[in-house]
Amino acid sequence: MLSPKRTRFRKQHRGRMKGISSRGNHISFGKYALQALEPAWITSRQIEAGRRAMTRNARRGGKIWVRIFPDKPVTLRPAETRMGSGKGSPEYWVAVVKPGRILYEMGGVTENIARRAISLAASKMPKRTQFIIS
């Protein structure tokens, strides 16, 4: 699973996802891509599940690029803990994705193989996405 090697701070505020993605919203490596249509936090597990689904479906053919990286720590408090006594400890990592962001790219395969592989990855994502061609 993806996570940063080291970070400047252990914990982060949740923040909010306003507007559309201004970066990473064009295909730059492959020919086909999966684009987010709604704002979401995508966990490192979901990113990995999507990547695995695509690689298994493509079967050695083509190349896959993962265009997002989980760099935001999400903290959780233990179950049945009273309020107070500080913020919880970091449990997992998420990538903050705004509408328009490219999640995965694929190249070196035919369109129908890419469509099938990318639709499998899309089913692993928590929000609506679309298939695009450069």
Swiss-Prot record:
Asked whether the UniProt record includes Glycoprotein among its keywords, one would answer: no
GO terms in the biological process aspect are:
mitochondrial translation
Q: Which UniProt keywords apply?
A: Chloroplast, Plastid, Ribonucleoprotein, Ribosomal protein
The cysteines covalently paired via disulfide bonds are none
Q: Which Pfam families match?
A: Ribosomal_L16
Q: Which GO terms describe its cellular component?
A: chloroplast; mitochondrial large ribosomal subunit
NCBIfam families according to UniProt: rplP_bact (TIGR01164)
Under the subunit heading, UniProt states:
Part of the 50S ribosomal subunit.
Put simply, this protein is called: Large ribosomal subunit protein uL16c
Q: What is the lineage of its organism?
A: Eukaryota, Viridiplantae, Streptophyta, Embryophyta, Tracheophyta
